[in-house]
């Protein structure tokens, strides 16, 4: 089930939290690391980061089609593999092993990403 963030996010807190994400993600368009660039990521259609090789789990979910809106990102940041499995309709694994446990942290990171 999708759930929109229950809390209003704080972009400044999200920026601090993003430092953990920066180990695998860039905020610069066209600069991919282990994970895709997160520039303009909120509202982006799945699988559209140029030059990034998505994992098979993400590709399987993309075949069903989705947009990385706030509801998707909330669920994905909580449990990436579970969200991809839900969309694909079969067990999938995300390349992103990191999970956020606190709803407040999720809302803060999404709010920060909306500014990028």
Regions found by a protein language model. Name each.
Residues 2-18, 29:
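Electrostatic cytochrome c docking/interface patches
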Residues 19-28, 109:
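The canonical Cys-X-X-Cys-His
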Residues 33-39:
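Short cysteine/histidine-rich zinc-coordinating motifs and their immediately flanking basic loops
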Residues 36, 51-72, 77-105:
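Axial heme c-ligation environment in periplasmic c-type cytochrome domains
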Residues 43-53:
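Short microdomains enriched in Cys/His and/or Lys/Arg
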Residues 105-114:
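Thiol-/selenol-based redox modules, centered on thioredoxin-like
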């Amino acid at each position: 089930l999708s759930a929109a963030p229950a809390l209003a996010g704080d972009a400044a807190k999200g920026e601090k939290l993003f430092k953990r994400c920066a180990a695998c993600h860039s905020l610069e368009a066209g600069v991919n690391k282990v994970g895709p660039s997160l520039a303009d990521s909120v509202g982006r259609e799945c699988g559209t980061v140029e030059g990034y090789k998505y994992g098979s789990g993400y590709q399987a979910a993309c075949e069903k089609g989705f947009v990385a809106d706030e509801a998707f990102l909330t669920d994905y940041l909580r449990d990436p593999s579970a969200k991809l499995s839900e969309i694909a309709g079969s067990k999938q694994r995300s390349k992103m092993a990191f999970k956020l446990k606190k709803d407040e942290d999720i809302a803060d990171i999404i709010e920060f990403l909306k500014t990028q």
